[in-house]
Each structure stands twice: as structure tokens, then as C-alpha cells.
Amino acid sequence: MLCLCLYVPVIGEAQTEFQYFESKGLPAELKSIFKLSVFIPSQEFSTYRQWKQKIVQAGDKDLDGQLDFEEFVHYLQDHEKKLRLVFKSLDKKNDGRIDAQEIMQSLRDLGVKISEQQAEKILKSMDKNGTMTIDWNEWRDYHLLHPVENIPEIILYWKHSTIFDVGENLTVPDEFTVEERQTGMWWRHLVAGGGAGAVSRTCTAPLDRLKVLMQVHASRSNNMGIVGGFTQMIREGGARSLWRGNGINVLKIAPESAIKFMAYEQIKRLVGSDQETLRIHERLVAGSLAGAIAQSSIYPMEVLKTRMALRKTGQYSGMLDCARRILAREGVAAFYKGYVPNMLGIIPYAGIDLAVYETLKNAWLQHYAVNSADPGVFVLLACGTMSSTCGQLASYPLALVRTRMQAQASIEGAPEVTMSSLFKHILRTEGAFGLYRGLAPNFMKVIPAVSISYVVYENLKITLGVQSR
């Protein structure tokens, strides 16, 4: 029987030996040879049961709930390979040792800022010989029985754009760990995110349609409110009219997400060279370019969504009929109306959303991440809601101008409305407030959209066989 033990040092007392977990299958004569020990700070002993479960899950190949000797050896070999890769990524100077500056730099690349004192504290916990540097042996010995490395754990728990869908797919794509890519879990995350987005958008579609109506039709002379807007929609087309435009809005999730992810992965290789994870500004550049490529590819669907949301009862028989009529009357160029303000809106939305989310993530990791990088449901929802709200607030004037340009049908002989002329017209006739028409229903849908997409995402993950949070 293979027995792994924890020795928990207590100041002023003898060391106490605690059984960590036992594994059957080791010959009795080898028991003393393969008895392993690991030292942890006494304040961390409360987590040893969680560590036990993680190690068993990581190495249990036959899913019998325990480790035999062969499984344990395989676990050690596989885990040592992963630790070697992480050690090399942290060793910026390639001198075989990690110092405090390299720890700070590696975490800074992920958007996690720590002080030099905090880096030295991390260093001291692993440094056995007092050199204030960590060599490979010290790194391996410290982490060998810890089944989750910090960097992949942060990436795993702090997914953002994959989980949260507020209707504006302009966020920077999430990172995926090496293991998620190798095992194919990344596409399951994307499928779960797409399904969550479909349910979330359908549930909040009435608020989204009201936002579009207020962006296009509300003015000083037509002061459309939330109650008045809903009353007008129901009176004109009944309760079903609240979901006009939702079909195309859901339909565009799959192609947009797939194109954006593939473009992001290709651009990452150009921007980040051979680095596994990108720095924040590199993520912003790569994510914005990927978003621009994805939006350019599916932009005609954005125009169709706006036209379908604004249609009167009986105006179009469906999406294809709407597309045919636009093509016949206005030409191909009509499918790219509002394209320029839409592209310009990517930078402020994606940039501020990413900056706010990373700032909140960094603050939480610094102050509350003691034994795990898992923030829990409410922290994740709060961070996602706040970052999405800030991103939308910054890019909203461009989104409003885009929607008005998409809604404008060409009249023969009439001049084309440009982005700059529309901005000037709104400011002259309605003031700065006019650039924020429809903001109230837009913000009203953020919390339910984020909450619904999270719940559906977590349930779809289980269905698709993705490891639960």
C-alpha cells in the first residue's frame, strides 16, 4: 500500500504526521521506499482534503476512485512534464533559476500585478537553501503533489467572454490552457458558450428590441419611454412582436464565435511569438483584430437583425425575404451600412471591458486568493457585469449611430448619411443626451443576460463532459 503523508510544522511543537491518502497495489516490501512526504504551512492544512481529491482525480485512469501504484507513477511523470514547461516559461533569463523579478514579470504578463515583497514571499515558500532563487529541483519538489499550476488555474477559473453574453460580441476572446487545447475541451467551451448566448439573448430579446426602437425612433419630439415602448410594440404586433429580430441575432452566434476564435489563435502567433499567454496589450490587439475580422464576415447579418427588429407586421415574410428586398432596392452596399462606426466601437468596448475585468480580477487575486484562484459564482458575475457595463457605456454613441445607419433605407436621389453628419445632426437637434437613447433598457438587460448565460453555460458544460468549476 502506497501511503503519502503530510508533515504539518507547528511552531514550538513537534511535527505531526497526517495521512494524506492511501493507494492500494504497492508490494509490502516496497512500502518504505515509496513513502513520500510533503511539507505545507500549518495554516494551509485545512485544504489537504481538497488536494487529496484533486490528485486522485488527476491520476485515476480507470475511474475507480483510488490510485494504484501504476496510476500514481504515471501521474508523477505527466505532472513533472507540465511542471518543467511552466518552469521554463517562468525562467525568462534561461539561467535555470527563477528570481523575484521573473515571478513578477510572469504574473504581470497575465495581468496580475504583485509587489516585490509579495514575490519574495512566494519565493521563500519554495526556496530551501536561502539563495532567494528557485532551481528546478526546488520547483519540482514543492509542486509535485499540487495538481494545479497557478497560471493555468487563473486561466481556467477566470474565463470571461466565453461565459458572459450581453448581446454585443465585441469582447476579447478567452485564453485556453494547454490541457484544454490538447484534449479538445476548448471547442466544448465554445459550444457551451454559444448555447448559453442563444438562451440568454432569447430571454432578454424584448429589452434588446426596445433598445433598437429607442435608438432609431426616440427623440425630443417622440419621448419614448420603457413602458410606452413596450405598449407600442404589443399594440402593433402582439406579444410575439417582442422577439422580432431575435432569430437572426441567435443565428449569428455560431459563425461569429468560430471565426473570432480561429482568427484570434492565428493572430496570437504573430503578436505573441512563442509565448503561451499574451500580455494584456497583446491580448487587446489580437482580440480587437479578431473581432474586426469576425464582424466583417457576419456584418450583413447585423444589418438584417436591425431591419427585422424594426419591421412592421407583415412587412417581411422572414429573414430571406428581408434580405432579398434589401438587395433588390438598395444593392449590396446596404448590407454594410454602419460598418465604420461598428469597427470603431470595437476598440473602446473591448479595451475597457478587458481593462476593467483584469483590474477587478487582479484585485481579487491579490486580496482573497489564498488557496485557489477560483473566485466563486458571485464574484465572477459581479466582475463580468461591471466590465460589460463600462465597455458598453464607452462605446454606446458609436453603437447608436451604427444602428441608425443600418436602419436607413435608401431613397432614390437622396444623399447617403455619413457617420460624421449623423453625429452632428444628433448633437445639434438632441444634444449629447441624444447619443445615449435606449441606454436604460440596454443596461437593464445586462444583469439578467450575464446571470442566465452563466447558469446555462455551467449546465451545458456538464452535458458536454467539461470539467466542472
From Swiss-Prot:
The gene is SLC25A25. Residues 1-189, 265-287, 358-380, 458-469 are mitochondrial intermembrane. It is a multi-pass membrane protein. Electroneutral antiporter that most probably mediates the transport of adenyl nucleotides through the inner mitochondrial membrane. Originally identified as an ATP-magnesium/inorganic phosphate antiporter, it could have a broader specificity for adenyl nucleotides. By regulating the mitochondrial matrix adenyl nucleotide pool could adapt to changing cellular energetic demands and indirectly regulate adenyl nucleotide-dependent metabolic pathways. Residues 166-469 are annotated as: C-terminal transmembrane transporter domain. Activated by an increase in cytosolic calcium levels that induce a conformational change of the N-terminal regulatory domain, uncapping the channel and allowing transport. This is Mitochondrial adenyl nucleotide antiporter SLC25A25. Disulfide bonds: none annotated. The chain crosses the membrane at residues 190-207, 245-264, 288-301, 338-357, 381-398, 438-457. It comes from Homo sapiens (Human). Residues 1-165 are annotated as: Regulatory N-terminal domain. Ca(2+) binds at residues 60, 62, 64, 66, 71. Residues 47-80, 78-113, 114-149 form the EF-hand domain. Widely expressed. Expressed in fetal and adult liver, skeletal muscle, testis, ovary, hippocampus and caudate nucleus.
